[in-house]
Amino acid sequence: RFALLIPDNKTGVAVARAAVKSAQKNGVKITRIGFYTPGTTDFSDITKQMSDYNARTGRLQNLKNSLKAKVNAGDANAAKVLARLNKTDTLGDVDFDTVLIPESGAGLKAAVAMFGYYDVFSPQVKFLGTSVWENTRLNRESTLIGSWYPAMSRTHNAYFNKKYHALFNEYPQSLYAFAYDAVALASALARNNPADIDAAITTGDGFVGISGMFRILPDGKNEHSLDIIEVTRSGDVVVDPAAKKFSAALPENSPESAAQAYDAVPPMIFGKNKSEAERLIFGRTLAGNYDYGAPADGQDNGGGYGFSF
């Protein structure tokens, strides 16, 4: 179950659309989407809402009140549970296991810190990023240890960077590799002179570029094999290297099929009008109402006193 914390702009909407399609293809659900003002470093309100902090503290207080009554009646076991509860701030889990935050710098650090303030921590909840996380020394932030983000193949990029530096005595910008690959692909196609240029360009096998495998899809979009990077205390580590070949292309989901998948139980929207957000992300408003089975205040969650250790 995924939550998205995205900027309220075209980039944020693009990330949300891509996340919805990917989630549908991989059989997972997006349960919450929060929008924030681009450039802000104040995430206190949006993270508090997304983490159900008031409801979770309310459940805790209700349980404490119930236990106090039992303690006053002489229940020794209730006293032990109450003592443990006094060391916690909330009761109950959030309805997501992962949060995607396409933000970097001070904004990213502030957002993750506020999630922690409202009792949403790693490793119980994993934080994910986009390629904007690269080269930002995230291992200095203890709250981000264990987080993941994608990046261009470091093995391929290291070779390109070394060759470029040897020629120009400086390191290339990230876009330079794409330009190199585009020229190399055009050159290869010109040499081979294929009878069907469109079929040659959109071959499912793709091409080996200077920054890894890539392929061009019939609709003009492209796919690129990426490393998955984990933030560790000693630095960023590749935990899943970029694929050396592509698997069969998955059929592209239509916007309507994505909308239908969420009609029964749509994601909760924070920081933006619900209908407007749904139209931007899904192409139309969704039919259903929120219901992710969150326990009601004071509901017994186990352990005989609504709490387990």
Could you describe each region identified by the protein language model?
Residues 1-309:
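Extracytosolic ligand-binding ectodomains
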